[in-house]
Amino acid sequence: MKNSLNKAIIIAAKIHKGKKGRNREPAIMHPIRVMSLMKNNRSRTVAVLHDVVESGKITIQELEDIGFDPKVCKAVDLLSRKKGQKYFNYIDNIKTNKLATTVKLADLTDNYLRRKQNRTSSKVDKQKIKKYKKAYKSLTGYSLKSTIDHV
């Protein structure tokens, strides 16, 4: 499984190479932060791969062909929002898989914290924060803010 994590990091680094994320940081930093919140190598592998399929540069089939565990591929597939898919239908699909849910919760937490740290929140930031909170509550039944405030 450790070898899979190494492969996943290499793939994610190649796909995110040269791209910038929020606050103009290298895009790879987000999946690395999400990965760092995971407790085992399977969930770390999913975390580092969670955005790669949406990039359009690799498919679930290619991840399977590389030899990633079917459970990893299933979770990554659920975490890859399909074109035209409504956001909360996407969240409902994630709920069907514990591994995908675990990674999505870490993803939402990281996204929430990055947007909250902006000194001047834009209207878009506020809308995204509201969406993250609603998705988190949908997945857990708990408030994202109250959960983070206790960490």
Q: What residue ranges belong to the model's regions?
A:
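Active-site helical microenvironments for divalent-metal-assisted chemistry
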Residues: 1-151
